[in-house]
């Protein structure tokens, strides 16, 4: 593996409360820009998803809202999700709406856009507290989701029916993703494995990684359908090729890396956040090369990464900031 190039972000807060922090980054012209959320109350920002209007949604886990951030003005808007809400994950659906995993309400919540209409899809009656985490849409347009208490579930979007299945080996389901072919994979943080869902039966088949007790936290597919895994316990970034069954593993740079979020952009560049180093890394699989993007703020706490063409969005759960790395 080649040495990393360190590109620590530079810049300082401007005088205006919502002024952006610009961080020029060398080489490929990528740059980081950051904003304080500037909301009247602490949101507990957790996950982000690009919205169809050029804004960015975020889950306000602490306040029970869906946030919408406007990069042009630096302004945030909060949409209340319901009593007891504690949203975790958010993604944009095929219908251009925000779909949210809300562990506080024990429901999947849809927020229409731009009408902001809120609809909850509760888990089936009798389902214990699920600790809902993340969601992904399959090739048929149905939503699959994880519950860290030990479930994997589905919302049949056309009918609104919600079903759940117990996860293999109990608690731990966390990250989930869909491949370009429409298949769905998820990972177990407590179980240290990844799994593929049979979309017809809802059952999951476990795939064992080469590193024991690695703490698979999140997964993401590249354009070839390979599954990239952020390993919390081991500090590794790994990839599984379902076609060949082959695994590859790379240790994140640094003394004590803690890999949390993983995302693959439109160029098949992999992005992974490191709690141990207060940084985000890009990884070029062709050159097997990491590039580091550091934060000016301590304990940024990037728990998830998502983007759109030319933009990689980062929610800073530890600082109430939102950041973007522009790659084009």
Give residue ranges: language-model regions:
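Conserved beta-strand positions in repeat-built beta-propeller and related beta-rich domains
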Residues: 57-62, 100-104, 143-149, 186-190, ...
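Short loop/turn segments that connect beta-strands within beta-propeller blades
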Residues: 70-74, 112-116, 156-160, 198-202, ...
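A short loop-to-beta-strand structural motif that recurs across blades of beta-propeller domains
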Residues: 65-67, 107-109, 151-153, 193-195, ...
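N-terminal secretory signal peptides and thylakoid transit peptides that target proteins
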Residues: 1-16
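Beta-propeller fold detector
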Residues: 33-36, 77-81, 119-123, 163-167, ...
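Beta-rich, blade/repeat-based domains predominating
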Residues: 40-52, 83-94, 126-140, 170-181, ...
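Blade-level signature of beta-propeller repeat domains, shared across WD40, Kelch, NHL, RCC1
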Residues: 303-328
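A short helix->beta-strand "capping" segment at the edge of beta-propeller domains
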Residues: 28-41
């Amino acid at each position: 593996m080649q040495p990393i190039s360190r590109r620590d972000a530079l810049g300082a807060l401007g005088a205006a409360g919502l002024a952006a922090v610009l961080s020029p980054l060398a080489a490929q012209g990528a740059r980081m820009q950051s904003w304080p959320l500037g909301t009247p109350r602490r949101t507990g920002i957790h996950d982000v998803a690009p919205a169809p209007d050029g804004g960015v949604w975020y889950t306000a886990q602490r306040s029970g809202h869906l946030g919408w951030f406007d990069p042009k003005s630096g302004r945030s808007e909060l949409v209340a999700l319901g009593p007891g809400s504690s949203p975790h994950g958010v993604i944009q659906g095929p219908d251009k709406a925000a779909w949210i995993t809300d562990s506080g309400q024990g429901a999947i919540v849809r927020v229409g856009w731009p009408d902001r209409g809120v609809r909850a899809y509760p888990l089936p009656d009798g389902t214990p507290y699920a600790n809902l985490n993340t969601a992904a849409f399959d090739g048929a347009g149905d939503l699959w989701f994880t519950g860290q208490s030990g479930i994997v579930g589905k919302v049949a979007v056309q009918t609104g029916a919600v079903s759940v299945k117990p996860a293999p080996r109990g608690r731990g389901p966390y990250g989930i993703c869909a491949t370009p072919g429409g298949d769905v994979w998820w990972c177990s943080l407590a179980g240290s494995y990844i799994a593929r869902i049979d979309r017809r039966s809802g059952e999951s088949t476990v795939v064992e990684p080469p590193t024991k007790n690695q703490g698979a936290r999140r997964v993401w597919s590249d354009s070839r359908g390979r599954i990239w895994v952020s390993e919390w316990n081991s500090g590794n970034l790994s990839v599984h090729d379902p076609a060949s069954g082959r695994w590859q593993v790379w240790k994140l740079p640094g003394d004590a890396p803690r890999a949390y979020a993983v995302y693959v952009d439109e160029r098949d560049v992999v992005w992974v956040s490191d709690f141990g180093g207060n940084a985000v890394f890009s990884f070029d699989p062709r050159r097997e090369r990491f590039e580091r993007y550091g934060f000016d703020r301590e304990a940024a706490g990037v728990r998830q990464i998502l983007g759109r063409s030319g933009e990689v969005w980062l929610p800073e759960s530890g600082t109430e900031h939102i950041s973007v790395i522009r790659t084009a």
